[in-house]
From Swiss-Prot:
Region (Required for plasma membrane localization): 300-470
Protein species of origin: Mus musculus (Mouse)
Pfam families: Cation_efflux
Protein's name according to its UniProt entry: Calcium/manganese antiporter SLC30A10
Topological relation to the membrane, as annotated: Multi-pass membrane protein
Function statement: Calcium:manganese antiporter of the plasma membrane mediating the efflux of intracellular manganese coupled to an active extracellular calcium exchange. Required for intracellular manganese homeostasis, an essential cation for the function of several enzymes, including some crucially important for the metabolism of neurotransmitters and other neuronal metabolic pathways. Manganese can also be cytotoxic and induce oxidative stress, mitochondrial dysfunction and apoptosis.
Transmembrane portions of the chain: 11-31, 35-55, 82-102, 114-134, 234-254, 271-291
Expressing tissues: Specifically expressed in fetal liver and fetal brain.
Domain of life, per lineage: Eukaryota
Keywords in alphabetical order: Cell membrane, Endosome, Golgi apparatus, Ion transport, Manganese, Membrane, Transmembrane, Transmembrane helix, Transport, Zinc, Zinc transport
One of the GO BP terms on file: manganese ion homeostasis
Gene: Slc30a10
GO cellular component, one term: early endosome membrane
Subcellular location: Cell membrane; Golgi apparatus membrane; Recycling endosome membrane; Early endosome membrane
Subunit field text: Forms homodimers. Forms heterodimers and high-molecular weight oligomers with SLC30A3, SLC30A2 and SLC30A4; heterodimerization is mediated by covalent-bound tyrosine residues, occurs probably in a tissue-specific manner and could mediate the intracellular zinc transport activity into early endosomes and recycling endosomes.
Length: 470
């Protein structure tokens, strides 16, 4: 289709058709004195705006990253567009609801039901065409997404598997999803201790596990990626179709049983605003889930279907791991989940095997973009050593910037927050003191005392880090 894809041509076709019927319904609504037709015309206006947002956000999302300002590209543009469409439709529904309530208080008749019926029927036909078009777009998108997932991905070349953040003579290469740009991290000081550094394993370009049944596992485990942008546009078209149904029903009633000018308003005058209120409720019941889903993505919350407690329990069974901290799981877009975590790894054990087992755990949970930072822990050192505190070995350089960290010191361990019982021979309630680390007083009154998770009431000050130790 030339410079435009089939999806873009359909959006442009609906844009022109919707603009024409918006003008027609607006004029007919004022001439026929129909609140349903007027509300339906403004639904058409919302469709125009949603189509423009859908076209713009889709174009931006397809653009590749230009320069280093957008390391993830612009794939979230469609998420922002879907949220904008849903919020705008919600605000429009509130306005229509207020107008319908006022019309219930002061009912009015439809002056020209024949004109309203004709325009409403044509608007319903346009909306049915739009529903068929965008349902087809959603089906095509789902097929294309499944096709991309089943293609074998090219594995990046691997050199030295160990990377470093502040670790001498080590490097790690990471590829940002959606960008294809490799970033190499190199250490700068040769005099630092090995345990003060951190080894980074980045798998953000894709899962490098050579699993033979990956397509089947992906179909079963992975969350189906949905076109949020198309859902936002489809939601507007569905709401407009419901409005057209209300217009047609009201016009048919007044056309079959017309009211004379001298007759007072009866039950027929309440049909129009009553059905409008029902239409608003139906639209809002579909708009709120879309707002919630897009807001969860933009707030980088843990995606639905990911059980943090189960993941932590499985991570605790990996040999050689002493603690897990700085665990973050979020969605870049719908269906593409990213996880980052810090691992306290016991010195002398094989961390490559631990890395593979950790990535297998996330792989079976449907998380394939995993970044692991390993931190060495020497169990032979004294208990008062800093590295045995099970805190992060690569914090901020100075204590003044500790509050700017995503998990600042003094927060409760993940095991205390989610009540997850850990294994590997250590209690999740164990803690270690340090002169260098700040202390935080924790009130233990009212804490649950089951599964062995009890604290002494005489313990007044205790330092906890946002880590889970095993």
């Amino acid at each position: 289709m030339g410079r435009y894809s089939g999806k873009t041509c359909r959006l442009l076709f609906m844009l022109v058709l919707t603009a024409a019927f918006f003008v027609a319904e607006l004029v007919s609504g004022y001439l026929g004195n129909s609140i349903a037709l007027l509300s339906d015309s403004f639904n058409m206006l919302s469709d125009l705006i949603s189509l423009c947002v859908g076209l713009g956000s889709g174009y931006i999302a397809r653009r590749g990253p230009r320069g280093s300002s957008a390391t993830y590209g612009y794939v979230r543009a469609e998420v922002v567009g879907a949220l904008s469409n849903a919020v705008f439709l919600t605000a429009l529904c509130f306005t229509i609801f207020v107008e319908a309530v006022l019309r219930l208080a002061r009912p009015e008749r439809i002056d020209d039901p024949e004109l309203v019926l004709i325009v409403g029927a044509l608007g319903l036909a346009v909306n049915v065409v739009g529903l068929l078009i965008f349902q087809d777009c959603g089906a095509c998108f789902s097929r294309c997404t499944r096709g991309r997932r089943t293609r074998p991905s090219q594995q990046p070349s691997q050199g030295d598997p160990r990377g470093a953040l502040g670790c001498p003579q080590e490097a790690a290469t990471a590829t940002a999803p959606g960008s294809g740009t490799a970033v190499t991290l190199r250490g700068s000081s040769a005099g630092r201790k090995q345990q003060e550094g951190a080894t980074v394993f980045s798998n953000v370009a894709g899962d490098s596990l050579n699993t033979e049944n990956e397509p089947e596992e992906t179909t079963k485990k992975e969350k189906k990626s949905e076109a949020l942008n198309i859902r936002g546009v489809l939601l507007h078209v569905m709401g407009d179709a419901l409005g057209s149904v209300v217009v047609v029903i009201t016009a048919i009633i007044f056309y079959v049983q017309p009211l004379r000018r001298e007759d007072p308003c009866n039950w027929q005058c309440y049909i129009d605003p009553s059905l409008t209120v029902v239409m608003v409720i139906i639209i809002l019941s579909s708009a709120f889930p879309l707002i919630k889903e897009t807001a969860v993505i933009l707030l980088q919350m843990v995606p639905k279907g990911v059980n943090m407690e189960e993941l932590m329990s499985q991570l605790s069974t990996v040999p050689g791991i002493s603690s897990v901290h700085e665990v973050h799981i979020w969605e870049l877009i719908s269906g593409k989940i990213i996880a980052t975590l810090h691992i306290k790894h016991q010195k002398g054990t094989e961390y490559q095997d631990a890395s593979r087992k950790i990535r297998e755990i996330f792989h079976h949970a449907g998380i394939h973009n995993v970044t692991i930072q390993f931190e060495t822990l020497d169990l032979k050192e004294a208990l008062e050593q800093k590295d045995f505190l099970l805190t992060c070995s690569a914090p901020c350089i100075t204590q003044s910037c500790a509050k700017k960290l995503c998990c600042p010191p003094g927060t409760l361990p993940l095991a205390l927050v989610n009540g997850c019982a850990e294994h590997n021979g250590r209690s999740s309630r164990e803690s270690y003191r340090s002169i260098e680390a700040p202390e935080v007083a924790i009130d233990v009154d009212g804490c649950p005392r089951e599964q062995g998770q009890t604290l002494s009431k005489t313990q007044e000050r205790q330092h906890y880090e946002n880590s889970t130790h095993f």
